[in-house]
Curated annotation (Swiss-Prot):
UniProt GO molecular function: SNARE binding
Similarity comment text for this entry: Belongs to the SEC6 family.
Disulfide bonds: none
Compartments (UniProt record): Cytoplasm
Function: Component of the exocyst complex involved in the docking of exocytic vesicles with fusion sites on the plasma membrane.
Organism whose genome encodes this protein: Saccharomyces cerevisiae (strain ATCC 204508 / S288c) (Baker's yeast)
One annotated GO biological process: protein transport
Keyword Metal-binding set for record: no
Protein name: Exocyst complex component SEC6
Transmembrane is among the record's keywords: no
UniProt entry keywords in alphabetical sequence: Acetylation, Cytoplasm, Exocytosis, Protein transport, Transport
Pfam families, alphabetized: Sec6
InterPro entries on file: EXOC3/Sec6 (IPR010326), EXOC3/Sec6_C (IPR042532)
Miscellaneous notes: Present with 1080 molecules/cell in log phase SD medium.
């Protein structure tokens, strides 16, 4: 397995590895496998068809070659038959050859005599065409120039071959005769180069005729090159066979001498002599070597495109370098013209559109690579990725590219690197933004020099959360605008991580500040004069904790809105990733809100330390401790209720009710004896819980959850009174019923009650506690064996101090 698949697997399995996640990964990999198999089958079918077609063509070629050989054999047979059928054939043959030689010599003489005039005529035509704008005139003499120049070059090449078989004097004469031709060829090449540069402009100027004539020249040159290459290969093969035959006929001594020659002569085939013989026999009647004008065309197209990109690079330099991304439409316009107009003017097998596209892609890729290597800012990276997306979409929509044919102008590896670079830059910037935001909002939270803000409903809030999600939304909006799902998911993932860190920092700050406030309160109660400047704690912590709690609800709403809005813009796979990342932050917001709520409760009940310490004491039976507790809670709750989000307040009041009861029962740790005579204990209990009940009924007035909240919390007090007042022999039965409700309770409650009951001896207490503990363990074992999963109860956190001693 390559490193890329390994990295992909690592990316998939990092983080949460729940069964659901494993199933999702499996489904994703199966989908990818199906896609790959489909693509492989599609490509296999395509290439199988091409191979099948090639085999058919090969068989056809084989049959054609066989047919040609048969026809050649028939011609040879007819020639031999005629040769022996005619009297004095040799004399006639030599006379014919002599006549042909005289005729050829006469023709060469005439062409040499008129060659200078021909050169002057061609040059005049070339000068005239080079002086005019071909896009306006249409270059009317183009085909004439090419025809005349081609004839002149053919004549020159043939005469040069002949001269090499003659004297050196003849060779010098020939060189002098044709010395002017090279300059004229250069002018013609210059004309062709200019026309090649303007091929696309010909279509714009409606000079389609000129484009067709230009391509006709290149087409003729290509066909003539192919023809002479085939002839040269035939001559080469024939000469090599003759050479091999001559070596075999040499005596052994001469062959040995040839092998021992330290500097053997290198012969280049076809030889000049071989070409000369074919010229004289009439096999070669035009050029003697390929001229490569097809490559001249391709190079001209490539150079013209490179030159256009060079001009563009010169235009966009320095600070304007990245502005080039907004001025790329001309590339698509050029390619559209090539596809719709130019491609119709030249032979289909040239695939002229691919020639243009490949060079445009090469130059564009080079340009984009340079931009990427310039370490662009985040917004520029997005522009680059957006252009790449536009480039690919345009190829599919306007040029008919299939999904497999489309390729990234950046390059797949470079694109992944760009994704990472963008996300890394975003993380750096977002970390800086969040860091600055946290510093500002924590300073406000710790100093508390002004009260929190209030919205139109009177709910308290701080500015930090709104500002934080404005940053988040802005970056997500930018990422969504790129139409790159990976970018969008990456931004959501990174920002979710930052939100999680921010949540942890809030929990830490809240915990520290509550601890500081409690410490201040305790020192103040003991001796106000002992408080140092370091101990000083600004007021308003309650209001700020309410504001922080409310902010978490808003933050959760923001996160859900972002998930809903932007998840719809991507595929199901990416949508699930976005949802998972943002759902992870929802738990964090709930934790911060819970931390704030519990902090409020800690502060509230810290004010009630003294009355709770007197519960079950002698003064309690006729005292007003419960009323004092209720009045204090009422004062707090009346202030908090209109300032706290209603959903949060329900959860908050649930915790307050539970804490009221837990603190009440915790008074068992002082081991005050219950006074059950004349039902004094029972009456005091009823009195207190009537007070608490009325308090919470009033606070929850109008709330649909009122009865449920009060009932589920106050039920424990019924068990408490039964365990405290019923006969000893019924305690275990009551305990059994208690466990059915409060399955996660400790034994502490029963121990505390038994220690406070005068009618229970030490030995009886130990026996009951032992049996009750066994019942507790047995009940939990049964739950586990039966796979019962229940919600935690209020009594899960009830602990008495003497249990720690």
């Amino acid at each position: 397995m390559s490193s890329d698949p390994l990295q992909q697997v690592c990316d998939l399995i990092k983080g949460d590895l729940s069964l659901e996640r494993v199933r999702d990964i499996k489904e994703q990999l199966l989908k990818e496998k199906s896609v790959v198999e489909y693509q492989l089958n599609k490509e296999s079918d395509k290439y199988y068809g091409e191979v099948e077609e090639s085999l058919k063509l090969l068989n056809l070629s084989k049959n054609s070659v066989t047919s040609i050989k048969q026809q050649i054999n028939e011609v040879n047979k007819l020639g031999n038959d005629n040769r022996f059928a005619i009297n004095r054939y040799d004399i006639l043959f030599r006379a014919t050859k002599l006549y042909e030689t005289v005729n050829t010599t006469s023709s060469i003489y005439d062409r040499i005599y008129n060659f200078v005039a021909l050169m002057e005529h061609i040059e005049r035509l070339l000068v005239a065409e080079l002086a005019e704008d071909a896009l306006e005139t249409g270059c009317p003499h183009l085909l004439e120039i090419h025809f005349l120049l081609t004839s002149a070059r053919d004549f020159q090449e043939q005469v040069v071959v002949m001269a090499k078989e003659a004297t050196e004097d003849a060779q010098r004469t020939v060189m002098k005769l044709f010395s002017r031709l090279s300059g004229i060829i250069s002018k013609f090449d210059k004309l062709l180069d200019g026309l090649t540069y303007d091929i696309v402009e010909m279509a714009r100027a409606e000079q389609i005729s000129l484009a067709i004539r230009l391509f006709k020249i290149y087409d003729l040159e290509e066909r003539e090159d192919l023809r002479i290459e085939a002839i040269r290969n035939i001559i080469k093969k024939k000469e090599i066979e003759i050479e091999k035959s001559s070596i075999k006929k040499l005596p052994n001594s001469k062959n040995t001498a040839r092998l021992q020659d330290e500097t053997p002569k290198v012969i280049e085939y076809p030889t000049n002599k071989g070409l000369y013989q074919e010229i004289m026999s009439g096999t070669i009647s035009t050029r003697t070597a390929p001229r490569g004008y097809k490559h001249f065309l391709i190079n001209g197209i490539n150079n013209s495109i490179s030159e256009m990109f060079g001009e563009m690079r010169e235009k966009y330099v320095g600070d304007q370098k990245f502005d080039v991304l907004d001025n790329m439409d001309w590339i698509f316009n050029e390619l559209i013209i090539v596809k719709e107009h130019i491609a119709n003017c030249c032979p289909p097998h040239w695939n002229i559109f691919e020639v243009y596209f490949d060079q445009y892609y090469k130059e564009l890729h080079s340009l984009i690579t340079d931009l990427v290597e310039s370490e662009p800012e985040t917004i520029i990276i997005l522009d680059i990725l957006a252009f790449d997306k536009t480039f690919q979409d345009t190829l599919k929509q306007d040029f008919g590219f299939t999904k497999s044919e489309v390729k990234s102008v950046i390059g797949d590896k470079e694109k992944e690197t760009l994704f990472k670079d963008y996300l890394n830059l975003i993380v750096v910037k977002m970390t800086e933004w969040i860091g600055n935001l946290e510093k500002a909002e924590f300073d406000v939270f710790l100093e508390r020099s002004t009260p929190p803000h209030s919205d139109s409903d009177g709910l308290l809030f701080l500015d930090g959360t709104k500002t934080c999600f404005q940053m988040f939304t802005q970056q997500v909006e930018v990422a969504a605008g790129t139409n790159q799902a990976k970018i969008l998911v990456g931004v959501v993932e990174r920002f979710s991580d930052l939100l999680t860190k921010r949540q942890k920092n809030w929990i830490s700050k809240i915990s520290e500040e509550i601890k500081k406030q409690i410490n201040y309160n305790h020192k103040y109660d003991i001796d106000p004069e002992s408080i140092t400047p370091e101990d000083e704690c600004p007021g308003g912590l309650v209001e700020y904790l309410i504001a922080v709690s409310n902010d978490q609800m808003k933050a959760a709403d923001y996160a859900v809105a972002i998930s809903s809005k932007y998840g719809k813009l991507v595929s199901k796979v990416y949508e699930k990733q976005i949802t998972n990342h943002l759902e992870g932050t929802l738990d964090g917001f709930a934790e911060v809100a819970q931390c704030s709520s519990l902090g409020l409760i800690t502060l509230m009940f810290d004010d009630l330390r003294k009355p709770y310490q007197e519960i079950f004491s002698k003064t309690w039976y006729m005292g007003s401790q419960a009323q004092q507790i209720a009045d204090t809670l009422d004062e707090y709750l009346l202030d908090i209720k209109p300032q706290m989000n209603s959903v949060l307040f329900v959860n908050f009041i649930d915790n307050v009710i539970g804490e009221t009861i837990i603190k009440f029962l915790t008074a068992l740790s002082f081991e005050h004896s219950f006074k059950n005579k004349n039902n004094k204990f029972l009456e005091a209990m009823k009195r207190d819980f009537e007070i608490f009940y009325q308090l919470f009924v009033k606070v929850l007035d109008g709330n649909e959850s009122k009865d449920t909240l009060i009932t589920q919390n106050f039920t424990v007090m019924e068990f408490f009174m039964d365990l405290s007042c019923e006969p000893i022999d019924s305690i275990l039965d009551i305990w059994q019923k208690y466990l059915e409700v409060y399955w996660d309770s400790r034994i502490d409650l029963l121990v505390g009650i038994l220690k406070c009951r005068k009618d229970v001896s030490s030995s009886e207490r130990k026996k009951i506690v032992q049996q009750a503990t066994e019942m507790l363990h047995e009940y939990r074992r049964n739950m586990e064996a039966n796979g019962v999963d229940r919600e935690p109860t209020l009594m899960r956190r009830f602990v008495l101090e003497f249990e720690k001693q």
